[in-house]
Amino acid sequence: MIERKHEGPRSGTGARFADTVAIDFCDGERDLYGIAWITRLPNAGRVRASAVVFAGGELAEMTEHEDDGAVDDWGAAQASGVRMTTAVPLERWSLAVTGSSVSLELDAYALLPPLQLEHPELSHMTGIEQYEHVCRVDGTLGIAGSSTPLRGTGRRVHCWGEFGWDRVDRWRTLYAASDGGRAISVAAARPAGSDGHDSELRWARLFGTDTGEPAFDQVRLSTVFDAGGLPAKAGLELLNEGDEFPLRLGGEAVCGARSERDGHEIAISFFRWSLEGEPAYGCYEMIARR
């Protein structure tokens, strides 16, 4: 069960232990999307800050810096132009980004209780623990001296651990959230050395469900990639035992970008989804070993 204490900095013994908070936003009406991360690397004495922002379907900012230093408190964390604060644990946060081309300030308000990644086999394979909130976001985005209001949905994720890249070839997370309050989170890991899609471990769950309700029994995720390797289209079928029909989602990317880090390819796409006919938005992240 996620409690207020989990909002504090997490610790671990491994040399590659990382403690990361990410906040993203989707404003479909104004065609504004973005995500920012701060990653504590306490056992290495380093901290990494990253941000990706899109406007009008185009990449407006992509930045990443890793430096010597420390972030000791998620209540007020700052690194290389990215600032995150916790106003009320598990309820309200803020994000500010100062980049070469954009400036961003937003507040994020939890719409539903936190959702914890609970899949023992998946957690063992990846080596991480994670919880997340689907949020309402409200703020301002400045590009080239012009300021635009930003309102929509988003997600805040807190994850920590020493990721098992000796056991994992590819890691994917995605979510879809509608203005009507429905939201779904998905995570998937493909084991190292596996022969394809069928060996991937997958987990999916609705936000806001009772903590005793299990995740979906069957998670079918299909993705079409564009020529640059970015997720372009995706389909989900989620089924529980006894259900006559699956819960279906279909989505198409509205923007995306790729980067590389430490022998891994990172793809970030923002999707417009149809959640059983209801419009929804969300971020699709993928990290794969080269």
Regions found by a protein language model. Give the residues of each.
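Structured soluble/peripheral alpha/beta segments that form catalytic or ligand/cofactor-binding pockets
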Residues: 1-290
